[in-house]
A protein has these predicted regions:
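Electropositive, gly/pro-rich neighborhoods at or near active sites that engage anionic ligands
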Residues: 2-85, 89, 93
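Long, charge-dense
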Residues: 94, 99-133
Length: 133
């Protein structure tokens, strides 16, 4: 029985084949781009998740962003875990549970919490803005 690298691969051969095929189509359709070898897999996955090729060219990275993210993930378990807070549930649902577990990362979103809703109503603002404060 072979072990699947759940960090970079889908869990099944069929899933891997579909993802690899999709990524090949995206690479072909996107053509040349100005992203680094570290940045392109992120942009390609954004295109894959949204079926929106406009992410190619619109996405910008701080020069240290990718390295900072990798360092955070690699050190998360040693620090007792890490947390991703999102403003919508869809982000949390869209993240791979095996990958999150591998790195010791937990996701959280509070957009539907009663206190967030009540505070947003009281201050006549959005729930996402209330979460950020």
């Amino acid at each position: 029985m072979s072990t699947v690298n759940t960090v970079t691969e889908q869990l099944t051969r069929a899933g891997q084949a579909i993802e690899h095929g999709s990524f090949a189509i995206i690479d072909e359709e996107a053509g040349p781009h100005a992203y680094t070898d570290e940045q392109w897999p992120i942009v390609r996955r954004m295109i894959h998740a949204n079926a929106d090729f406009d992410f190619n060219g619109l996405t910008r990275f701080h020069p240290a962003a990718v390295r900072a993210g990798i360092d955070l993930l690699l050190g998360a378990k040693a620090r007792g875990g890490a947390h991703i807070v999102a403003d919508v549930e869809m982000i949390c649902v869209g993240l791979s549970a095996p990958r999150l577990k591998h790195f010791g990362v937990q996701t959280h979103q509070f957009i539907s919490d009663d206190d967030v809703i009540e505070r947003a109503k009281a201050e006549d603002t959005t729930r996402a803005l209330r979460m950020a404060c």
